[in-house]
């Protein structure tokens, strides 16, 4: 996920401290140059979006079952953001639900991928690396 000029920045929106810690360890081992920041709820992600700071990230890993503002609400807000870079940013939904309606709703709202928890770290990082490489190559193109 790391391009020639900078490390990728990944935002994980995850309320489970155990899940967040697992991701910190996995990122440290598999993508040590990537910057991973964790928000424990969807409200924080929406605050960052409202403040215009969500564009600082290159990829969002988004849990669906968050306290307060749910993951689908965050995803809908990202996809309707005023900033085109934010609207197009890759979003990977992470969910314990494999209910077809939940998966379809994620894609209908614009998710780039929907990965069921507990997830295979290999599958997750393959997705992160593929979307990350693509996104970092797109955002570095001249306007």
Predicted regions and their residues:
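Residue-level signal for the "D+5" position in two-component response regulator receiver
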Residues: 38, 66-69, 100
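A short, hydrophobic beta-strand element within the central beta-sheet of small alpha/beta folds
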Residues: 85-98, 106
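Conserved acidic segment of CheY-like receiver
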Residues: 7-27
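C-terminal output helix
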Residues: 119-130
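Short amphipathic alpha-helix used as the core "switch/output" element in two-component signaling
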Residues: 47, 72-87
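Acidic, metal-coordinating helix/loop segments flanking the phosphotransfer/catalytic sites
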Residues: 38-59
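Active-site residues of response regulator receiver
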Residues: 62-64, 95
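Alpha4 helix (beta4-alpha4-beta5 surface) of REC/receiver domains from two-component response regulators
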Residues: 73, 98-113
């Amino acid at each position: 996920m790391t391009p020639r000029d900078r490390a990728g920045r990944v935002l994980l929106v995850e309320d489970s401290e155990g899940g967040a810690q697992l991701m910190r360890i996995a990122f440290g081992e598999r993508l040590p140059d990537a910057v991973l920041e964790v928000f424990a709820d969807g409200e924080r992600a929406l605050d960052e979006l409202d403040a215009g700071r969500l564009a600082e990230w290159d990829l969002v890993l988004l849990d669906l079952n968050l306290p307060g503002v749910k993951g689908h609400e965050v995803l809908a807000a990202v996809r309707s953001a005023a900033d085109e870079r934010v609207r197009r940013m890759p979003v990977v939904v992470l969910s314990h639900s494999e209910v077809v309606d939940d998966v379809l709703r994620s894609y209908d709202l614009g998710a780039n991928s929907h990965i069921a928890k507990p997830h295979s770290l290999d599958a997750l990082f393959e997705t992160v690396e593929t979307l990350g490489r693509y996104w970092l190559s797109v955002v570095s193109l001249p306007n």
